[in-house]
Amino acid sequence: LSRGLGDVYKRQIKHGAVPRAVPGITVGHEMVGIVEETGRRVTKVKPGDRVTVNVETFCGECFFCKNGFVNNCTDQNGGWALGCRIDGGQAEYVRVPYAEQGLNKIPDSVTDEAALFVGDVLATGFWAARISEIGEEDTVVIIGGGPTGICTLLCVMLKNPEKIILCEVDPK
């Protein structure tokens, strides 16, 4: 199992910025793993498959899911559930609600470490670029040049804005 645990995530939980977080839950929402077993409705993956796990779980049926805002899924297991309300990637085993849309097979040619970027880091950048309605005459500002910021930069570049500004703290 490969997993990441971002500094922002840890600070948000520690300082109460995630009101739906359940005390005592094992954290971790960026993960890659091997399927041990599946529910009866899961057909896209099978035991033994290496998979990425989406950061958001979503029902696919509510208003928000049908309109592409899966992070606001109204189902009790929807939205940011893994590592927040359900044991996450730092646990030995993880139950993934709505696994049919929440797991993606990893090709053999892709390492676990590379695949780890898909579930949250790249997905965040892609989502930001997608919903921002960026036009070719726009200037886009990205705050933070860490892995998520760089993935956001790459996705924003696909929109061809006039200017892209990436802000990062000078470590000196």
Regions found by a protein language model. Give the residues of each.
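Glycine-rich beta-alpha junction loops
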Residues: 6, 55-58, 69, 99, ...
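Cytochrome P450 core scaffold surrounding the K-helix E-X-X-R motif
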Residues: 10-14
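N-terminal Rossmann-fold NAD(P) dinucleotide-binding loop
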Residues: 149-150
